[in-house]
Amino acid sequence: MSNDNHVHGGDPRRELKRLGLETRDVLDFSVNVSPLGVPSEIKAIWKELLAEVDRYPSVDGQGVACYYQKRFNLDPARVLAGNGSTELIYLTPRALELRKVAVITPSFHDYTRSSLAAGADLLEVELKAEEGFAPLGFDILKEVMAEADGLFVGNPNNPTSTVFPRQLLLDLAASFPNKWILVDEAFVQFLDQPEEVSLIRQEPPPENILVFHSLTKFFALPGLRLGAVVGHPDTISRLRPLKEPWSVNRVAEKVALELIKCADYEKRLSSLVCLERPRVFNRIQDISGFQPFAPAANFLLARWTLTDQLDDLLRFMLGSGVHLRDCRNFPGLQDNFFRMAIRQPEENDRVLSLMRSCSDHYL
């Protein structure tokens, strides 16, 4: 499968070239990772990790699995570690032999790519901008599940920040016990009360729900690729034999074990996002030319309305040293939508100031 359409944030050089701008240092708001950076606990052992690279990792990523077992008090049989949660998102439709997969759009493109790679047909279900990208109701999802044998749900969804109630997903799974609910919780730790949304600790675990979880975004470690899929032991046992060995490197395993010690980092990050998210949203609402949608996670989706070309905004911001995520490659977001991360207060203030300057320029 070609990677030509595998567009994502985190590549300002590509955007600088596309927009005809000179190469420069930028503040990257296009990726949704922790603004606190790598935890100090990981920085402190970084030189020691060099001694690990001449040794094989465990075959099945036990270091990463151990993090989930200790942090969330999970039975080891419920956890399958991966080279980031994306590896496991691709494994699942193939391992479960899904033939028709429902995907809520707009959402993370790899739900679609993984389903197509497994030979499945797609059923796209749209979140509507005119409804504020509100979560779909139970009756609509029942109709969807009647036609598909699996449903991918980002919770919270990227890029809309939509949150689906936990009980809704549990009720859906109970109503269709022979079909699969595949829940991507890559950003769940950024919510105000993640324990009220997450299914990772659900007891007893439904056999037809799988939860994908990532450590790379919350702990600012996207280059290491750390994640897992969590589910009923019988379901995980179906996936385990089909997952490639050695996919989690030894450094990632060692780092995962240290993340168990990062409770203070978790508290500081949660507090920061909880305070900055509503502040940034409210400030953008007051700037002409921007239509923000209420965020729940550590990122915000908005629409540029002062001109017909989103590139007018992107060029102004990038030329001033700030990279936003162009969302026009998401289904349903072609009409000048962009996404921005929630970062440190002073960084957010810089972006807000530039947005106001851009608005004044085009008014």
Predicted regions span which residues?
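PLP-dependent aminotransferase class I/II
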Residues: 38-39, 208-286, 290-293
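Active-site phosphate-binding strand-loop segment of PLP-dependent enzymes
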Residues: 123, 129-191
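N-terminal "arm"/small-domain region of PLP-dependent enzymes with the aminotransferase-like
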Residues: 1-55, 146-149
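Conserved PLP-anchoring active-site segment centered on the Schiff-base-forming lysine
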Residues: 95-116
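PLP-dependent enzyme catalytic core of the Aspartate aminotransferase-like
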Residues: 167, 319-320, 331-363
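Conserved PLP-binding catalytic core of the aspartate aminotransferase-like
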Residues: 273-274, 287-320, 342
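Short loop-beta-helix segment that forms the pyridoxal 5′-phosphate
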Residues: 57, 69-91
